Each structure stands twice: as C-alpha cells, then as structure tokens.
Amino acid sequence: MELSSRSISAVTLFVAELDRSKRWYAEGLGLDKVFEDEHSAVFRFANTIVNLLVASEADELIAPAAVGRAGTGARSQLTIGVDDVPAACATLAQRGVALLNGPVDRPWGVRTAALTDPDGHIWELAQELP
C-alpha cells in the first residue's frame, strides 16, 4: 500500500479542558460537532475529522509514548487552505479568535496567518499567491 496516495482521515488533539476546547472549535472555527462523549468531541473538517481527547485519556492510545506537558512550546502546526486569508482572519476576529501573526506574504508564494487553540495547538491559514 502506498501511503502517499492516501489522505489524512483524522487528527487527534489532546486537550486539558474539553468544554473550553469544544467551544473554541465550534464557535471560533465554526466546525460541526459529529460525536461527543465524556472524554472526547469530534468535529468534521471537510474530509478530515478533528478529535479532541482529554489528555488524561490519551495514554492508552499512544503507549508507550507519553502525553507532552502543556506550555513547553509548539511542536506542530496544522494548515487550513483558504481562498482569502484576510477575509478568513476577519471572520475569525468576529468570532473572538485572536491571531498569533499575519496575514503575512511568505517568500515561498503563500499568504499566511497563524492562530492557536486554548491548548496551544497552532493552526495556520494559507492562501496561494498568484
């Protein structure tokens, strides 16, 4: 099986406070929740699901690895392709979502803006420049 011909079907993010994170993804990003239980909430993002899992429940999922400590710095960034970064930023601002940076035109031909969820997961908005 060639992995390069597959798509990413799910992203699981470990969170400290599920209710706070659910609000951010539903109200801030405007995602639709498709499942919820006491330890997780799943949101649909196009063809990918974003699973928010309470960090204390993640050990079994990733053993023998361990959940990293919050507040030690970013280790990844998830990118959302959009048609118009400034317009997307304006929509997010109306929803109370603050940006880390941007919009910025990058030397590799992409306009970007970055934001962070309540648990420090970095999200980037990216638009190809003509």
Features from the language model and the residues they span:
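Conserved active-site tyrosine of GNAT-family acetyltransferases
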Residues: S21, Y25-A26, L92, G120
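Conserved beta-strand-loop-alpha-helix junction that forms the acyl-donor binding cleft
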Residues: V15-E17
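Polyanion-binding surface elements
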Residues: T12
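Vicinal oxygen chelate
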Residues: M1-S9, D32-I80, P86-T116, Q127-P130
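Short glycine-/small-residue motifs
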Residues: I122-L125
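Residue-level marker for well-ordered alpha-helical positions
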Residues: D19-R20, P86
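Major-groove DNA-recognition helix of helix-turn-helix-type DNA-binding domains
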Residues: L29
